[in-house]
Structures are given as C-alpha cells and as structure tokens.
C-alpha cells in the first residue's frame, strides 16, 4: 500500500517540501505526494512590489505548480475540514462545488498567514493589501483610476486626497512597496496635464523608530535618507488608529486625507488553523518540536508562517521570510523520508545568508554574510540574487526582458478596471480582504 503525503499550502514552504520529496523518492512509486492549494500557481513574492508599479508583468512572477512539481498530484481546491482523528482532508474546488476527501499518512501544514489589521476601526474594510497577485494587479489599477479621477477634478484639495497614497508598515514589504509606488506615481504624473507635482503624496507610516529594523542601523538610516530624498514622507514612531475611506486617522490625533491605504503592517496565522486539532501558542501558530513535527500528533508537520519555529541561532521566533520557509521545507521533507525509511529525524537549524531590500530607481540595501552594501551595487545584487532564485528558466527570461524594457520605455498606465471585474476581483476603488493561503 502506498504511503500518502499530503501538503496543504502551495507557497514557498509547501512547494519546498513537495520538491524535496520528489527528489528523495524519484524512483519510489510507493510514496504518493499530494499538494492542495486554492491556486494552481505560486507567486514569487519578493518581486511582487514591481507588479503594481508596472515594472513587471503579473504572470512573469508566478510559476504553475503542475509544471514545477511533475511527480506531485496538485489539487486546486479550498480546504474545508482537516480531521486529524480520521487522517482525512475534506476540500472542494470552490465553496459551492462538490467536496472530495483526501486521506493521508503524513500531513504537512504550510497554510501561511493572512494580513493582521489589529482590529483597527475601518482598516480591514478600506485598506488594500500586498500578499497576492490579485492584490498587486488591483493596486495597479486602483492607482491609475485615482489619477484618471483627479485629472478631471477641479478642486485642488480633492485632487490631493485622490493622489495621496499611504503605506502602513516599515518592514521589507512596506518599504519596497512605498519605493516602487513612489517611482511609479511620480513618473505617471507627466501624462496628466491638469495635475501638479505637489498633488502627489506618498507616505510611509511606521510605529518603530527606524524602518527596515531587520538590517543594521547604518543601512536603515541610508534607506530613510534615500526614500525621503525621493519624495516619500516617512513618519516614524507613528501609528494608524483608523481609516474611513476618506482619511487615515493617526494615533496622535492627526489625519491624512486620502483614499488609498496599503497595509503591510503585520500578519497572523491562517484562520483555518483554529478548526484543526493541533496545539497552538498564544499567537495562534502551530507548536512544533525541533524537527518541525507537531507534538502529540503522529505524522503531522507544520512550517512557515503558520508554525511557531524557534531560530536556534537567536532563540527568537523565525521571521516569516522565504529563506526560512524554503529551508524548513527541505528539513520537513527529509524528516518525512527518514520516518518512512526508518531513519532518524534531524532538527531544524538555519542561519540566513543575508537580507536585501529594494529602494526603487536602481538603489537598494543589502546585508550578506556580514558585509553591508547600499546604492547601485546593492540594487544589482538584489536583482541578480532574486533572478537566480526565481523558479523556471522561462520566468527568468521573461523577467529579464521586462527589466530590460523598463530601462528604455515608460511604465504602463493602462486602466484595466473591466479586466479586474471580469476576473472576479474587488472593484478598483474598493479594498478587499486578503486571500487566505
């Protein structure tokens, strides 16, 4: 009888597990690998901020799961129930579609995370997010829609409100989103003769005393100077209190009139975990031991954003980054293989090679193996490293072509509202809840 390994989640962690298992059991048909995800593709999220800015085509940073994982049975479906007692998963292609049951011997929980709005009034309703391809394409269309609207509005105050874009969160996602968005909106303004440069405003709101707290203070200070020098208004030690769609209220009592709030200020584990019989810590993440196995649940592993994994080098929780997720995936796959073959599992341990953050317009910061870089060379490193990590030769070539064209031609300002509606996304002027993965 075949040994059934089922992976729930097709992000960095889930695909890393499946890919490693395929290599470990390449010539062993007795091991069946199944991956369930609500999408049939994975997104290379480090490049996601370049999609709303028009630097990259959306489909060029995704890779089809079926093409990447040829030995894995990929099921595009939403998981409805995970019954750890019966070792079964109930899922369906959609909420209204017929359900099917998948049984497992080994279960891998790679469910990822969703955006954390911290219960702030109006934020979940009005804020946009940057966690999925749909988020990125919707943001692109939303921004162009605001320019088109502002170009027709004779009221200067109304124009400024329409063309003020607030990004919440000064981590990697927030800084890169603000930098790319700033480059895009500054360049787009030249196509709208009724608008003035002073009408456009990009603000980055961060509760900490410095942006990019994951890198050194020197690189953080460089990033701050670069963003401010390019027109991004960086508000440090500032918290957002609420959003009503017409303004963003700050905790100090001030308000920023705007119709665009992009939220990158935190994540929480996938709420599907609440219905699964596994131990969870105070933050809602699945508790795991040093081998990434769930204590007291035979054959169940958890990793990535949904798992409470301790970084052995620092003693702190592992950050929700692709580097850690991929390395965890390899360890989980090897420990499943060890369990099947009667071997001993190995503990997870990883020291990240470095951190990189793009600041737009051919500048970045990088901290690699103790060395620190900033400016053009760091930007070149950022692009080179992520291009190498992008799955698939075809995608690499397409991204290289996009970047080459971006050197010589202006970015696209086509308004795709009709296409957004046709795909079933939220309307461009209405924010939507993030997808749960």
Regions found by a protein language model. Name each.
Residues 125-155, 246-249, 255-327:
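FAD-site-proximal beta/loop scaffold in flavoenzymes
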Residues 13, 112-115, 178, 267-269:
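Short glycine-rich anion-binding loops that position phosphate/pyrophosphate groups of nucleotides
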Residues 334-437:
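C-terminal, flexible cofactor-proximal segment of oxidoreductases
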Residues 1-81, 165, 175-215, 262, ...:
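Beta1-alpha1 glycine-rich phosphate/pyrophosphate-binding loop at the start
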Residues 32, 72-89, 182-290, 294-296, ...:
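A Rossmann-like FAD-binding core segment of flavoenzymes
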Residues 6-8, 102-112, 132, 240, ...:
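Short hydrophobic core segments
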Residues 1-2, 73-168, 184, 262:
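FAD-binding core/adjacent interface of flavoenzyme oxidoreductases
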Residues 18, 183-186, 323-350:
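Internal hydrophobic alpha-helix adjacent to the cofactor/substrate pocket in enzyme cavities
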